[in-house]
């Protein structure tokens, strides 16, 4: 693979819209500039929180023994998640790729602010999105899904990789074809034999986590098989196997393996499928089947899976579960964006007592839309033009520092909504006015409701000191989000938002704190 120290990501790829955000990364769509086919890719930027060691040139392409990977010594050890994903992707390139059911890595670029992974673009959508959109859904479709996930797991497990965060949103179809392969992706929390940083274990989704992970036991490939068992249970019922009133009860149910097939729709599911789920959701990891063993199971092969359409109630529940899951996942990912917790305080220290009036905030929004050529994102020069247009000369000298504060992924652009939230957070608002202000800042299309992405941005503004002390416990963020998730339609009206605040005073204190001066 060719290597040129002067080569930058933007030299070879046209970078376009954001496909998704995580607490420590952002994924954008890209197009390779060279070649006749103009290959489309997904570019995942892993943000470096610490400083680079001296000698790592900004914007330069680094090299390593395999595919130009940056060597681990060039990556701050404290940035455990970044380092971990680089290590795992290196192992995948060496021992797994290419594989029809595991995401492919094409290229790697490192600069002083992070690492950019150029990945295979999976444009076919998430696993559950496709299932709920189908005209017909039968056990055979569910078996085909399990078969592909098991094939991907078999390959990564042979390479001594444990995914550790297997869930529906980490399984995407390559394209929109009916027979498109299903790809396992997002190996940021995965572990390999020679490296597992303890901080990685703080993350993950409790609904899919194994009993041994909750009880601080040894994490192995069999932990992924438990997660696959949870996915299969949901595929055949429309709801998760462990449902409880609170997070601690759910943890105990998982540790004890306390689930059932009593609900009436399970009567229509084959005994072979239920036996398979029971084997996957066995508390003792050694008694769970391996991915290789799963591939030879008669139900997974399709021999014993029913081809008759499932009970419509199951599909309806899947639709509801999917909408709820996506809204929660977006919020959780954004809450973990660690640097944004402190932005309100940092912004106040920059601009002193300069509090924007409501009409100035509205003017800021309008000028952003008018001047910025890239939708909601602005370059530094565009941000300066916005301040000039608003006749704010006192803030212009601070523009580079404010810009740097909000350039979350060091890509040279800032998100208009984050700037708006930052300035509005300097206002001293109370009661409904504060709730309305917080809500309106993210209702960017003035639709009267906020989408999952907008809810995520709102939670993202929570100051660190206002979060519960047990925030790192598995599933705690799920519990917080459940307080606001009134229904499962994928959107939240102001009345729903307000009702959630009135039901729980601690939640109101958390959210309103970002709108009050320190």
From Swiss-Prot:
Q: Mainly localized where? A: nucleus
Which SMART domains does the protein's record reference? EFh, S_TKc
Cellular component terms per the entry's GO annotation: nucleus
- Keywords, alphabetical: ATP-binding, Calcium, Calmodulin-binding, Coiled coil, Kinase, Metal-binding, Nodulation, Nucleotide-binding, Nucleus, Phosphoprotein, Repeat, Serine/threonine-protein kinase, Transferase
Q: Where does Ca(2+) 3 bind?
A: 485, 487, 489, 491, 496
In residue numbers, the region (Calmodulin-binding) covers 323-336
Top-level taxon: Eukaryota
**PTM note:** Autophosphorylation stimulated by calcium. Occurs probably by an intermolecular mechanism.
Q: Which reaction does it catalyse?
A: L-seryl-[protein] + ATP = O-phospho-L-seryl-[protein] + ADP + H(+); L-threonyl-[protein] + ATP = O-phospho-L-threonyl-[protein] + ADP + H(+)
Active site (catalytic residues): 165
Keyword Transmembrane helix assigned: no
The molecular function terms in GO held by this entry are: ATP binding; calcium ion binding; calcium/calmodulin-dependent protein kinase activity; calmodulin binding; protein serine kinase activity
PROSITE patterns (UniProt xref): EF_HAND_1 (PS00018), EF_HAND_2 (PS50222), PROTEIN_KINASE_ATP (PS00107), PROTEIN_KINASE_DOM (PS50011), PROTEIN_KINASE_ST (PS00108)
Subunit structure, as described in the record? Interacts with IPD3. Interacts with CIP73.
By what name is this protein known? Calcium and calcium/calmodulin-dependent serine/threonine-protein kinase
Coding gene?
CCAMK
């Amino acid at each position: 693979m060719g290597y040129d120290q002067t080569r930058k990501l933007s030299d070879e790829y046209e970078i376009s819209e954001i496909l998704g955000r995580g607490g420590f990364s952002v994924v954008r769509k890209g197009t390779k500039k060279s070649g006749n086919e103009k290959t489309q890719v997904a570019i995942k930027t892993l943000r470096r929180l610490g400083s680079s060691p001296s000698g790592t040139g900004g914007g330069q392409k680094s090299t390593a023994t395999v595919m130009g990977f940056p060597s681990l010594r060039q990556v701050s050890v404290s940035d455990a998640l970044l380092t971990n994903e680089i290590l795992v992707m290196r192992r995948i390139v060496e021992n797994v790729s290419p594989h029809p059911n595991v995401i492919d890595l094409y290229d790697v670029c490192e600069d002083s602010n992070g690492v950019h992974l150029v990945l295979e673009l999976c444009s076919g959508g998430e696993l559950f999105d496709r299932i709920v959109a189908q005209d017909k859904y039968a056990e055979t479709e569910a078996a085909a899904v399990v078969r592909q996930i098991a094939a991907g797991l078999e390959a990564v497990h042979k390479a001594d990789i444990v995914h550790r965060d297997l869930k529906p949103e980490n399984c995407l179809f390559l394209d929109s074809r009916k027979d498109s392969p299903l790809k396992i992706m997002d190996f940021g929390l995965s572990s390999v034999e020679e490296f597992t940083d303890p901080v990685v274990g703080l993350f993950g989704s409790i609904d899919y986590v194994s009993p041994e992970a909750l009880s601080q036991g040894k994490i192995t490939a069999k932990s992924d098989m438990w997660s696959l068992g949870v996915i299969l249970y949901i595929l055949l019922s429309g709801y998760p196997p462990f449902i409880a009133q609170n997070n601690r009860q759910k943890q105990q149910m998982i540790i004890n393996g306390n689930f059932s097939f009593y609900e009436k729709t399970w009567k229509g599911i084959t005994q072979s499928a239920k036996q398979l789920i029971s084997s996957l959701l066995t508390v003792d990891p050694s008694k769970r089947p391996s991915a290789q063993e799963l591939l030879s199971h008669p139900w997974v092969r399709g021999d014993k899976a029913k081809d008759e359409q499932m009970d419509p109630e199951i599909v309806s529940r899947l639709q509801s579960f999917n909408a709820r899951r996506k809204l929660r996942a977006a919020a959780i990912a954004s809450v973990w964006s660690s640097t944004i917790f402190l932005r309100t305080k940092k912004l106040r220290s920059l601009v002193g007592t300069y509090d924007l009036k409501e009409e100035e905030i509205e003017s800021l929004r309008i000028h952003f839309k008018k001047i910025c050529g890239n939708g909601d994102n602005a370059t530094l020069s565009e941000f300066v033009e916005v301040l000039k247009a608003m006749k704010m000369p006192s803030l212009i000298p601070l523009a580079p520092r404010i810009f740097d504060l909000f350039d979350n992924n060091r890509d040279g652009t800032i998100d208009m909504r984050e700037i708006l939230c930052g300035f509005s957070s300097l206002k001293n608002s109370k009661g409904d006015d504060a709730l309305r202000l917080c809500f309106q800042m993210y209702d960017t299309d003035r639709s009267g409701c906020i989408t999952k992405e907008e809810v995520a941005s709102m939670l993202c503004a929570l100051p660190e000191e206002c979060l519960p002390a047990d925030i790192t416990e598995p599933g705690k963020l799920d519990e917080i989000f459940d307080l606001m998730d009134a229904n499962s339609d994928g959107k939240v009206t102001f009345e729903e938002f307000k009702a959630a605040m009135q039901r729980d005073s601690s939640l109101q204190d958390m959210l309103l704190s970002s709108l009050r001066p320190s």
